[in-house]
């Protein structure tokens, strides 16, 4: 779980979605903006839509897997020359494979699938930011 200062507040989420700087790769869609110059840390927030499951327990499980995966990657990602605010959500049009895995109720397969998608998305995001700056 992220520390409180590393989590986005709702006013930040609204700002990011209005700003419309978006990166989409595979299952994840990332809304991002550069962090304020006086803040030397990243801020992240995840949103799991109701299309995944109407049960909050299932959505929370997916969210925890993504958060843990991102925490593992943070030390190895290569976009630390600048700090960012990122709001991450699942791409609603690409949920079919995730829903099939959730129907099977195979926890290990779910974890490996989400970690793989998260890794691919954030390495592509880092490369995108590197080319941009």
Where in this protein do the model-derived segments appear?
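Positively charged, solvent-exposed patches that mediate nucleic-acid binding
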Residues: 1-133
């Amino acid at each position: 779980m992220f520390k409180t200062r590393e989590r986005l507040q709702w006013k930040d989420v609204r700002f990011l979605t209005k700003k419309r700087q978006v990166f989409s790769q595979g299952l994840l869609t990332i809304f991002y903006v550069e962090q304020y110059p006086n803040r030397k840390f990243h801020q992240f927030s995840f949103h799991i839509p109701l299309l995944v499951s109407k049960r909050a327990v299932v959505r929370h499980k997916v969210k925890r897997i993504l958060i843990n995966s991102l925490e593992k990657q943070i030390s190895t990602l290569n976009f630390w020359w600048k700090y960012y605010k990122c709001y991450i959500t699942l791409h609603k049009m690409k949920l079919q494979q995730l829903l099939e895995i959730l129907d099977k109720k195979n926890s290990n397969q779910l974890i490996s699938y989400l970690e793989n998608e998260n890794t691919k998305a954030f390495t592509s995001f880092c490369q995108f930011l590197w080319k941009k700056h």
